[in-house]
Design a protein with these regions (language model features):
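Catalytic active-site module of serine/aspartate enzymes centered on a nucleophile-bearing elbow/loop
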Residues: 168-201
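Flexible "cap/lid" subdomain of the alpha/beta-hydrolase fold that forms the substrate-access gate
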Residues: 1-6, 10-174, 183
Length: 201
């Protein structure tokens, strides 16, 4: 109960799927370079650079080989998606991001999540939630969006359009020098902003 959902990337659709089925458990949303994917708004239908890359390597048969080695390639993959602030990278930082991927079996989610978009496999589950869940209850929650404008995975204009369709009066914060991983690019700005939002709601 009273969950503050703070989500980024795939956290948005996961948060949307959870909250539309259990809105009584959720108090507020903090979205960062993601979308709940329930607003029905799509400002840019062109594939992002990341999903063009996914399509290229899936069609060439090389995707599993690259994403299956995230234990050693995670930084390179994050740079493709939109990680801008390389000054944050230390050995501890690399160890933290590499640790979840000690072997190829551990990379299955990282391989399958982008393929869910590429093959549009997730759409039915989202639509089922919209049809059977309580979208009005979700829309009544306090929400904020933080969006790095150098995101190469999710078009910022799509994240903003989806958010505004659901939460038209909620704050949208954009950051021209941050990318998809805004929590890594601008933590000194983002953390106080989130604390302030929680205190106000």
């Amino acid at each position: 109960r009273d969950i503050t959902i703070v989500c980024q990337d795939w956290g948005g659709p996961i948060a949307g799927a959870y909250s539309i089925r259990h809105p009584d458990r959720v108090k507020r949303f903090v979205l960062m370079n993601t979308l709940l994917a329930m607003g029905g708004a799509n400002a840019n239908s062109e594939r992002s650079e990341w999903f063009k890359w996914i399509a290229k390597h899936e069609e060439a048969g090389t995707l599993q080989g690259i994403l299956g080695e995230l234990g050693s390639t995670v930084l390179s993959v994050m740079k493709i998606i939109g990680f801008e602030n390389s000054s944050r990278v230390t050995k501890d930082w690399l160890d933290a991001y590499s640790a979840p991927f000690p072997d190829r079996a551990s990379c299955v989610g990282a391989i399958e999540f982008p393929l869910d978009v590429h093959f549009n496999r997730f759409r039915e589950f989202i639509m089922q939630g919209v049809q059977t869940g309580d979208l009005d209850a979700v829309k009544s929650k306090p929400a904020m969006l933080a969006c790095g404008l150098k995101d190469r995975a999710i078009h910022p204009e799509n994240a903003i359009a989806d958010f505004r369709a659901l939460f038209p009066k909620a704050p949208v914060n954009t950051f021209p020098d941050a990318g998809h991983f805004c929590q890594e690019d601008i933590p000194e700005i983002l953390v106080p902003l989130i604390h302030q939002f929680i205190q106000m709601t």
